[in-house]
Structures are given as structure tokens and as C-alpha cells.
């Protein structure tokens, strides 16, 4: 089994923000797997399905981003998953909009959701799918925290569906072919563009 965690904040106020890109990718995966409904479990929205021969658990924490680990740890523990079977999809300021990178382990780069998950799991050795949202424009008057809680720009929205699809493709590669093959394909593809 692989647990895919899409990070975001609960509630309609945050639904269209950059910080909720993980929820969008989880929803795309659920759609592809023909998940008919989510259920409330592990302090979030949860679905069990399959992708090929692999069992797949999808989780959208219902906690706020800064305490996402309170949802992730119970799910990973319940299914007795090794951390390399946990894939966390999150927004990444340090990548240009729509760029995707897969990696195993690493620091939190100031991302409070990752910080919480690492703290709760007691390790950072889980898989991350980093979805680029870019840095705020120079004329942006707020902080990075303000930026991630804003909606995507119109030009970004025009490309968002395709980019979310590419992120879901990358997760599918992890599930079907393993992390190394998925990293080789996904991370190389982005270098070529």
C-alpha cells in the first residue's frame, strides 16, 4: 500500500489558494481511480482504492496545514507503512509555477506542513512531490505566507489543469514503477523544458 497525502487547508476560503495544490492533486488521483466518495478518517478526508495491482490510500488532512502531521501519522501508523511508502504532495515556493520534482527525504525548506509531518513521524524520510508555485512577484506587498494563501493568477489558472495532471502522472509513476523510475522520468522531464 502507498499513502498519498495532498496538503492543503480545510474550508472553502482556502480551496483555490496556492497552498492547497496538494488537495487538487489528490482530487485528480481520486477521479482517475474512480473514487466515488471520501470518508472522514484520520482527521481528514480519506479514500481507499487501487492503482494497478497496488493498494492506494488518499488523504487530505482536515487539520490546518501547520498541524498536518496530526492527520498523517495516525494513517501511516494504522497501515504500518514504511516512510518510503508515504508520498506527500505540497506547494513549493522555490520552484517555478507548475514545475514538479520528486525526492525522498530532506528538510522542510520553511514549509510548516512538512515540518509538522516530520515532527509527528519522527523522520523526514518520506517521499515528497514538490509542486512549484514560484516566488511572489517583486511588486507583491505581502509575505511568503500571504502569497501562498492567495489564489492563482489568471495566467497560472489557464495552465493549472494540465500541471495538476502532470503531478498526478508523477504520483502514478511512483505507484506503478517505483520512486527511482518516477524520479528519473519526472525530474528529467522538467530539466529538458
Label for each model-derived stretch:
Residues 2-105, 114-130, 137-146, 150, ...:
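Nucleotide and nucleotide-moiety/phosphate-recognizing core
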Residues 108:
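Conserved mid-domain beta->alpha element of the FAD-binding
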